[in-house]
Swiss-Prot record:
Belongs to the MraZ family. One of its GO terms (molecular function) is transcription cis-regulatory region binding. It is found in: Cytoplasm, Nucleoid. The lineage of its organism: Bacteria, Pseudomonadati, Pseudomonadota, Betaproteobacteria, Neisseriales. This is Transcriptional regulator MraZ. Forms oligomers. Signal peptide: none annotated.
Length: 151
């Protein structure tokens, strides 16, 4: 399971140094590669190949014929998926096609989230964290009480 947030920079050639902690998890539990895809203009998702295969199967099984929003989301993820492998220095090349679709450039945060990694622009990540910390705790407690989540 991935966890933690790492402030990083994408170099001038589009390479991102993947922290050793994440590379070790990938090498130990999966293969030394990830599938990267767009989720929104704010972040890229990076899945171990085995996890991506599960997600892709679920996406392909979505009933999207009568739902253009879901169809576009399905297409966004599937059409932009690319396998990334790291070099001997532990870097992955973030493809130019993905980089041009997101609204961040060099300063990024690579976040571990259970079965995947998320690549956020640093400003977007900070804004998301500020919002999460500013959420009304009583409203959050109520919303959580409506779920099965046990913390």
């Amino acid at each position: 399971m991935f966890g933690g947030a790492h402030e990083l920079s994408i170099d001038s050639k589009g390479r991102l140094a993947v922290p050793a902690k994440f590379r070790d998890i990938l090498s130990r539990l999966y293969t030394p590669a990830v599938v990267a895809t767009l989720e929104s203009k704010h972040k890229l998702l990076m899945y171990p190949v085995a996890e991506w295969e599960k997600v892709a199967a679920q996406l392909l099984n979505l009933k999207v014929a009568d739902n253009p929003v879901l169809r576009r989301f399905q297409n966004l993820l599937l059409h932009n998926a690319e396998i990334l492998e790291w070099d001997s220095a532990g870097r992955v090349l973030v493809p130019a096609g993905l980089r041009k679709r997101v609204d961040f450039d060099r300063e990024v945060v690579l976040v571990g989230r259970a079965n995947r990694l998320e690549l956020w622009g640093r400003e977007q990540w900070e804004a998301e964290m500020v919002q999460a910390l500013d959420d009304d705790p009583d409203e959050l407690a109520f919303q959580l009480s409506q779920t099965d989540l046990q913390l």
